[in-house]
Amino acid sequence: MAKRCEICGKGPVAGKNVSHSNRHTRRMFRPNLQKIRVITEDGTVRTMRVCTRCLKAGKVQKATA
């Protein structure tokens, strides 16, 4: 399953956990993706994986149930 927003393309970013003793271990920062039903430009309804930033910005129009 893709961990990428279908609207803006935001995906996982590599980083490090840093402990109190300053040891570094690798980790991933993943976007907060939600599976929602969206009305597309051509008027069809389909399920998309969209990040919460795009949802809050109003870049997608949710389909009613």
UniProtKB/Swiss-Prot annotation:
HAMAP family xref list: Ribosomal_bL28
Pfam families for this protein: Ribosomal_L28
Family annotation (PANTHER family): 50S RIBOSOMAL PROTEIN L28 (PTHR39080), LARGE RIBOSOMAL SUBUNIT PROTEIN BL28A (PTHR39080:SF1)
Family indicated by similarity: Belongs to the bacterial ribosomal protein bL28 family.
Source organism (scientific name): Pseudothermotoga lettingae (strain ATCC BAA-301 / DSM 14385 / NBRC 107922 / TMO) (Thermotoga lettingae)
Gene (UniProt): rpmB
A biological process term (GO) from this entry: translation
Top-level taxonomic group: Bacteria
Example of a GO MF term: structural constituent of ribosome
This protein's name: Large ribosomal subunit protein bL28
Entry's Gene Ontology cellular component terms: ribonucleoprotein complex; ribosome
Keywords: Ribonucleoprotein, Ribosomal protein
Classification of source organism: Bacteria, Thermotogati, Thermotogota, Thermotogae, Thermotogales
InterPro entries: Bacterial_rp_bL28 (IPR050096), Ribosomal_bL28 (IPR026569), Ribosomal_bL28/bL31-like_sf (IPR034704), Ribosomal_bL28_bact-type (IPR001383), Ribosomal_bL28_sf (IPR037147)
